[in-house]
């Protein structure tokens, strides 16, 4: 029983950064912007969060720094793609490469240094309930943030007028502009929110998941978050389910290696990425699934005077 509970705990921990980053990207894509820089923003959030936490001794300051760094990196993306109308795909890829390189340079002095960790929110009495106690009432703070964030985004997109406006921009920015909606303003806010979420996800990696700095510690999670949005057909609750499925795959390969299963470790390590590719291939083969809820203006630049 203890082994099962521990496995479920590690799955929740592995799923949390995927969920936070994917929910942020979902809001960005609902506005019609395709941000392929999630991986770069996540790794910059990781190094920023670890650095601030290490220098101040406070994981909470580290967490705030991770959010700010991710938001600033996304602001750069927004200026380039929204104000300067650069290609969103090329810009996102460039920022990912920049983030990976810059984080490696900044993090050189942090390699091998002891980190600070966000404490778990152990609720006295409740966390001693068999099985569910540790799973529900003994998690790290960002576990609860990720669940609350999913519920909040779901409510915002489908229960508020502002959310409806954001979705209308993603479906047809020209029509929204004709109605007097400030398309660029909405997209700026959506992109910054997505970047802040990516930074927060990176902060989880360096302050909770592995409280130390390791170069390229995001390990492709930003790309998996992007795939999760497509897998979920741009629906928040499906992102939640998908994050835990991919989290289980991620943890499954680690436990398989620990238990000495006679399969090459390189193959086991590639399982999360293979699962991502398989899911995207299956979805792309089904035209109905591909078009379901896809924002019609996704990836298209908007320049009012054209």
Question: What residues fall within each predicted segment?
Answer:
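Membrane-interfacial amphipathic/re-entrant helices at transmembrane-helix boundaries
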Residues: 1-21, 34, 48, 55-64
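Inter-helical junctions in multi-pass inner-membrane proteins, predominant
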Residues: 3-8, 157, 194-227, 262-263
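Hydrophobic alpha-helical segments embedded in the membrane of multi-pass proteins
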Residues: 15-23, 40-47, 71-76, 170, ...
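Short, non-helical or kinked segments that cap or interrupt transmembrane helices
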Residues: 27-45, 82-95, 165, 189, ...
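Alpha-helical transmembrane segments within multi-pass membrane transporters and channels
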Residues: 57-102, 245, 250
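Transmembrane helix-bundle core of multi-pass membrane transporters
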Residues: 100-159, 259-268, 292-306
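Helix-loop-helix "hairpin" substructures at the membrane interface of multi-pass membrane proteins
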Residues: 135-213, 236-241
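Cytosolic-side transmembrane-helix boundaries in multi-pass membrane proteins
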Residues: 153, 171-178, 182-185, 256-306
